[in-house]
């Protein structure tokens, strides 16, 4: 009765507070060692959750790095986290300790999206037999269907032609190029996965791109961070369905595409696309409970290819066109090199790249300056490791700050400016820096890097071969600030695409 009247609540409240504080102290035991990386003092229970800005994590990391050094720690709720900055420390983690830092930490929100131990795809999969099996399959199959070969190059070149037609149809009007670039890159991925192409005005394609964008927004930001930090909240009935509605709709959309592909798949015929090849492996794996080839994992592999393979390259090209309208002298110099090496009639080819050092330097500088993936996907240590004289215990989440490498003032002459000469020597030859790692490094480096490099060169040169891009008359100069949502995209901007006349 005293408890109900409130007189007995104080002892219970005091006990609860003491219990929570003891649990909190237990989760901070790493900080009790003298060689643990320094960092801001965490709040009880919340840790440093309120001391970082999820909407602009790169800037939060920048400020903390300048205060605590190249290797510093955070406590997100009760999850210990170490942020690794600058080239030397990043190389230690990704290369020297590559085997010990290749695993991914658990992501509780993914369980709500149907991710299971044997259906994690490739990008977010735990480091182990299933990941090796799927990465080996993905690399092998992408090569089978043309990655690094003339066949895929011809497909990309053909799609670049369709993209040029779409720009021409605008008749020099002021447009935001983002949608058209997304459609072009989506078609390249769709060709690999489904062996099909969508017209740019196809409602099906427009719907798919809308769902991709919505799903990426849903899994980034403050709410997902809170749910991953305190996964018990995911048990609230209906919460996950409401928070991740767009993600689940996107999954259902892909399920329909995969079902359509399955109805026309003939196991007796050579695979037409990646989906056919995966379905063939599913058939082989029947009765093997250890295999990662199953229908659920097919969906996750496709999600990986669309998000990692399409969005990143389209975003980089969006940065490229923005920088061309902001730096017209650079644009004209690229066009001059295109005219000298390729001309204005023949389609660009990958063999041209070796003879176009300035264009190659500009593409690399776009990737460096755009810095679209500033924070590498999280990893977790599988044993104690030593980095820069600090000891990082087993089970610590690692965040690799690639932005600190791409914009390191000790490496780059003008780290915060767009400066293609970063990749040219005194004689004008192309030079690649070891600090250039937009695709990460080590065992979990981007498996689609060869495809992305091909797409960037062919789309970029084809566009500048046919058009001159400029800021629309009467409009202010666009900003080079980015919008962070897993990747960093330019703020919305407008441009005009004027068809180049022969000989100009």
UniProtKB/Swiss-Prot annotation:
Glycans are attached at residue 382. It is a peripheral membrane protein. SUPFAM superfamilies: Cytochrome P450. InterPro entries: Cyt_P450, Cyt_P450_CS, Cyt_P450_E_grp-I, Cyt_P450_E_grp-I_CYP2D-like, Cyt_P450_sf, Cytochrome_P450_fam2. It catalyses: an organic molecule + reduced [NADPH--hemoprotein reductase] + O2 = an alcohol + oxidized [NADPH--hemoprotein reductase] + H2O + H(+). This is Cytochrome P450 2D10. Pfam families: p450. Keywords: Endoplasmic reticulum, Glycoprotein, Heme, Iron, Membrane, Metal-binding, Microsome, Monooxygenase, Oxidoreductase. Heme binds at residue 446. One of its GO terms (molecular function) is monooxygenase activity. Cytochromes P450 are a group of heme-thiolate monooxygenases. In liver microsomes, this enzyme is involved in an NADPH-dependent electron transport pathway. It oxidizes a variety of structurally unrelated compounds, including steroids, fatty acids, and xenobiotics. Signal peptide: none annotated. Belongs to the cytochrome P450 family. GO terms for cellular component: cytoplasm; endoplasmic reticulum membrane; intracellular membrane-bounded organelle. Its EC number is 1.14.14.1. Its cofactor is heme. It comes from the Eukaryota. It comes from Rattus norvegicus. One of its GO terms (biological process) is xenobiotic metabolic process. Induction: P450 can be induced to high levels in liver and other tissues by various foreign compounds, including drugs, pesticides, and carcinogens. PROSITE patterns: CYTOCHROME_P450. It is found in: Endoplasmic reticulum membrane; Microsome membrane.
């Amino acid at each position: 009765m005293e408890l109900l009247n409130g007189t007995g609540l104080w002892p219970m409240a005091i006990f609860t507070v003491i219990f929570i504080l003891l649990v909190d102290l237990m989760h901070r035991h790493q900080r009790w060692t003298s060689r643990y990386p320094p960092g801001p003092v965490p709040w009880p229970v919340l840790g440093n959750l309120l001391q970082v800005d999820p909407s602009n994590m790169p800037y939060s990391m920048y400020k903390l790095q300048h205060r605590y050094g190249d290797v510093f720690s955070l406590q997100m709720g009760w999850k210990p986290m170490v942020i690794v900055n600058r080239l030397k420390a990043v190389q230690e983690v990704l290369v020297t300790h590559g085997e010990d830092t290749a695993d991914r930490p658990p992501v509780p929100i993914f369980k709500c999206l149907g991710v299971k131990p044997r259906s994690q795809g490739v990008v977010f999969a735990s480091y182990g037999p299933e990941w090796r099996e799927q990465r080996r399959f993905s690399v092998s199959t992408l090569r089978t269907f043309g990655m690094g070969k003339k066949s895929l190059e011809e497909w990309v070149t053909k799609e670049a032609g369709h993209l040029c037609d779409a720009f021409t149809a605008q008749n020099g009007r002021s447009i935001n190029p983002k949608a058209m670039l997304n459609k072009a890159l989506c078609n390249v991925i769709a060709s690999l996965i489904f062996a099909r192409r969508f017209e740019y005005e196809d409602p099906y394609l427009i719907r798919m791109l809308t769902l991709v964008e919505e799903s990426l927004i849903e899994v980034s930001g403050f709410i997902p961070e809170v749910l991953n930090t305190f996964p018990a909240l995911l048990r609230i009935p209906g919460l996950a369905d409401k928070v991740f509605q767009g993600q689940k709709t996107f999954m259902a959309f892909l399920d329909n595409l995969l079902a359509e592909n399955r109805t026309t798949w003939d196991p007796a015929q050579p695979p037409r696309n990646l989906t056919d090849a995966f379905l063939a492996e599913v058939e082989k794996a029947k009765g093997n409970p250890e295999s990662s080839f199953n229908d659920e994992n097919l969906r996750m592999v496709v999600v990986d290819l669309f998000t990692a393979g399409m969005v990143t390259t389209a975003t980089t090209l969006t940065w490229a066109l923005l920088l061309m309208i902001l730096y017209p002298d650079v644009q004209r110099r690229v066009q001059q090199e295109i005219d000298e090496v390729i001309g204005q009639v023949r389609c660009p080819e990958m063999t041209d790249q070796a003879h176009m050092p300035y264009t190659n330097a500009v593409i690399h500088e776009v990737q460096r300056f755009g810095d679209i993936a500033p924070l590498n996907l999280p990893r977790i240590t599988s044993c104690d490791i030593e980095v820069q004289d600090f000891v990082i215990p087993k089970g610590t989440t690692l965040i690799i700050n690639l932005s600190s490498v791409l914009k390191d003032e000790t490496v780059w002459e003008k780290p915060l400016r767009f400066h293609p000469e970063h990749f040219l020597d005194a004689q004008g030859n192309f030079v690649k820096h070891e600090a250039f790692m937009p695709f990460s490094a080590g065992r979990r480096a981007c498996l689609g890097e060869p495809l992305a490099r091909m797409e960037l060169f062919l789309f970029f040169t084809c566009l500048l071969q046919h058009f001159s891009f400029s800021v629309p008359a009467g409009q202010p100069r666009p900003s080079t600030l980015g919008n962070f949502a897993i990747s960093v995209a330019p703020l919305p901007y407008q441009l005009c695409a004027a068809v180049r006349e022969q000989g100009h």
